[in-house]
Amino acid sequence: AVVSINSASINHNPIFRSLHRYYEGSPFVEANIKNISDSELPVDVSFYIPTMMENPHTESITLPPKSDDTYNLGVSFSSDVLTSAKASFDNLVQPDIKVAYKQDGEEKLAQKKLESSYVLGKGKLTWSDPEMIASYFTTQDVVVDKFARTNIQAYSEVLKKYFGKTNLGRAIILYDALGSFGLVYNVDPSTPFLQISDDKSAFDTVKYPWELLDDKIGDCDDLATLYGTLLNNIGIETMWL
């Protein structure tokens, strides 16, 4: 064998399912790969994270001759990363990385197990990084879009008569629509926001907007996220304070 994997590590631990889009847009794995041959060598590098992938993520690179280099690799997750049966649960998993290549016409494979990683369920976040809440603003979701557009259209005459079609008027209509829809506030018994928002080590659970519209009951962060998402859907920018 002329290729070996000296080391490999994921840049994030724990791994938040809610941040899957962010992960896909930045380097996710760092791998040090050695090629002891005298020739450059095309290889396929793949790695797999249980519960988050149906198939390994694969990238093709060319190793320089007599090289011992570190490579930053991207990632792509399964389309059901938020909807699979395992998506609601926390999992301790052991990712692995493989390098496939040909040596003298023969298929060769170098592989290595990575350090175990915690994959947190789809609703988990930490308030140590408040910007994480942005990943729950699914403004283009069909359920969100239907709720926002249907209510704005249903009260278009009220909007025109009393609010002059202003953003404030549209915001009031959506706020009132959420009440008429039957949403109920209920403090999260396991992770009440006021108790854990300043605890940088605690994990909170937030519902996606489509989940709250289905459940009709949620904590303050669930309700604020849904309302902000609806406002963004109709073009009103919001900020979480």
Language model regions located:
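Beta-sheet-dominated interaction scaffolds and their linkers
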Residues: 1-30
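Short beta-strand elements
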Residues: 106-140
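Intrinsically disordered, low-complexity Pro/Gly/Ser/Thr-rich segments with frequent PxxP/GP/PP motifs
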Residues: 48-90
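Secondary-structure boundary elements
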Residues: 134-215
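Short, hydrophobic/aromatic beta-strand segments
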Residues: 38-47
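Short, aromatic- and glycine-rich surface loops/edge beta-strands on solvent-exposed regions
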Residues: 83-104
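Hydrophobic/aromatic-rich core segments of domains that either
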Residues: 221-241
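Asparagine-centered strand-capping/turn motif at beta-strand->loop junctions
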Residues: 31-37
